[in-house]
Amino acid sequence: MSKHLLLAFGALLLASASTASAQNLTEAQARAIIAPWYSLFNVATRGDVKSIQEQVLPTDYESCAGYLPGECWGRDTSIKVVGNFAKSIPDMKFDIKEVLVADDRVVVRGEVTGTPAGELFGVPHTGKSFRMMAIDIQTIRDGKIAKTYHMENWLSALGQLRAK
């Protein structure tokens, strides 16, 4: 009986240690983990999309856009989606405005700017630029971004592109 109690206590200790380490993630540590990811959205100065994503995202990474319930995709699709921004919005920039850390979650409020090179989401090319807010909730696991919930205000961006 004492062997089982000892094992249970050890498991509890291990669980609390991992929770404590997740809770001790500082803003500086969070920024260091997420920085390579956000550098990919600064299209003009980014590096190789695939190698950076493989560095910061585990193979079981999930990206959930939130536009449709349950709409999530994996790392390979994310590499394609992020890679396509260079073609559609060649001057795209992501400016991190705020980072909040809670346990293993990192919330990022950012501003995205850019000028589409052609039609964007059905809006004909106008040569106009847009500025929109983006909110991301990143789950950090083993020093990598394991899951992202993200919402960008594309409605506002498209409205700016359509404006007279």
Locations of the language-model features?
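A solvent-exposed, acidic/Ser-Thr-rich amphipathic alpha-helical stretch
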Residues: 50-103, 111
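Short acidic-aromatic low-complexity motifs
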Residues: 23-60
